[in-house]
Amino acid sequence: MASYGMNDVKNGMKILVNAEPAVITDTEYVKPGKGQAFTRVKYRLIKSGRVQEVTMKSTDTLEAADVVDTDMQYLYSDGEYWHFMQQETFEQVQADKNGMGGAEKWLKGEEQCVVTLWNGVPIGVQPPNFVELKITETDPGLRGDTSGGGGKPATLETGAVVRVPLFVNQDEVIKVDTRSGEYVSRVK
């Protein structure tokens, strides 16, 4: 297995920490006035999302993780698994609830996603940045409601709940930012 020296470590690299894949989020090289230089490495565990920090000597190494980000198309969910297909090879993989990481609330079918595979198994799914979903349930809009007057909760066709402006009604299609879970606009 490949390994990285402390001089080669950069943000975004995938490493193994205690046999679990992680992404480096921040590195800081520290050269104190007295003593040996060291590197502070901050990383996020891909499966759990926890952020941790470790201090390493300049002679230490980090093991590279066999983690691949692949563009795939979301096909369907059978209740227990979410199925994805690679467009070029038509190879299919299935992700469980842990592998989805909360992305399932933004997917209705045929969206292009980035699936993170570790040893061929999905451990993370990143949905498109923006999705268009239909509102299935919300309070009715009243006369005089404007965009500046707060908001109301709306349930989308996938089961996700987002805050929308008061003028948005049931059965309308809205655009949602999946990174923040916020309403962006109505779709005409």
Curated annotation (Swiss-Prot):
PROSITE patterns per UniProt: EFP (PS01275)
UniProt PTM comment: May be beta-lysylated on the epsilon-amino group of Lys-34 by the combined action of EpmA and EpmB, and then hydroxylated on the C5 position of the same residue by EpmC (if this protein is present). Lysylation is critical for the stimulatory effect of EF-P on peptide-bond formation. The lysylation moiety may extend toward the peptidyltransferase center and stabilize the terminal 3-CCA end of the tRNA. Hydroxylation of the C5 position on Lys-34 may allow additional potential stabilizing hydrogen-bond interactions with the P-tRNA.
GO molecular function, one term: translation elongation factor activity
Alphabetic keyword roster: Cytoplasm, Elongation factor, Hydroxylation, Protein biosynthesis
Location, primary (coarse class): cytoplasm
Organism domain of life: Bacteria
Keyword Phosphoprotein: no
Database matches in Gene3D superfamilies: 2.30.30.30, Nucleic acid-binding proteins (2.40.50.140)
Disulfide bonds: none
A UniProt-annotated Pfam family: Elong-fact-P_C
GO biological process: one example: peptide biosynthetic process
Subcellular location: Cytoplasm
Alphabetical list of HAMAP family matching this protein: EF_P
Family membership noted in the UniProt record: Belongs to the elongation factor P family.
Function in brief: Involved in peptide bond synthesis. Alleviates ribosome stalling that occurs when 3 or more consecutive Pro residues or the sequence PPG is present in a protein, possibly by augmenting the peptidyl transferase activity of the ribosome. Modification of Lys-34 is required for alleviation.
Protein's name in the database: Elongation factor P
Organism: Xylella fastidiosa (strain Temecula1 / ATCC 700964)
Gene name of the encoded protein: efp
